[in-house]
Amino acid sequence: PYTTLFRSSPELQNLIVAYSKSLYESPYRAYLEEKIGPVAFKNIELSLKGFDEKLIPLMQEENALTTEYKNLLASAKIEWEGEILNLSLMKKHMNSQDRDTRKRAWEKHTNFFVENAEKFDELYDKLVKNRTAQAKELGYENYIELGYYRMQRNCYDKDMVKCFRDQVKKYLVPFAEKLHDRRRQRLGLDKLAYYDAGMFFNNGNPAPIGTPEE
C-alpha cells in the first residue's frame, strides 16, 4: 500500500544516499563531473549533509505526520447549497462574481480549519519538534539549515533569502499596494476584504474555455 511505501521511503533514501556517496567519493569523480556536470555533485553534497541513517525513525515519523495532515485536509466535507464539497471545489465559490457568495464561501472554508484547529495545531507542534530533533541530531542549530539542504538550495542560502525578503518589503510591497488600490477602484469598493482577494473584475475573472480534449 501507498502508506507503507511512504513510511519506508527513508529506508529507500538511505540506499540512494549510499549510492550517491559512492559517486561523490569515486576516484573517477573528475571524469564523472565532466560527463554529468558539477551541479549534480553539488546536489549530492547537499543530500549527504541532509541525511544520516540514524534519522530514519524520525523521518518515518515525519512522513506519518505529513500523511495525517494531508488526510485531514482531504477529509473536508463542506455543505454548500445542497452539495457536499471538498476544499478544492469550494475555490470556485470563493471567487464568485457575487460578493455575498464569496463571503459565505470563505466563511464555510474557514470554519473547517476552525473546527479542526486543535488537530492542526497538534500536528504542527509534532512536526516542528520532530524536524528540530532531526536537525539537532545532525549538529545543526535548528531546521532552517537542514531544510535548505533537503530542498537542494545549491546556489543561495538563508542570508541571501533574507536580503530578498527585505527587497520585497521595500520595493514590491508598496507597488502591490498600488495595484490592489487600483483593483479596489475597478471593483467599485470602499475597502477590500479578505474575500475579495481573488477578484479582479466586476464581471468575473477570466475563465478557461473549451474542453479538456481541446
Residue positions per predicted region:
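A well-structured
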Residues: P1-D159, C163-G210
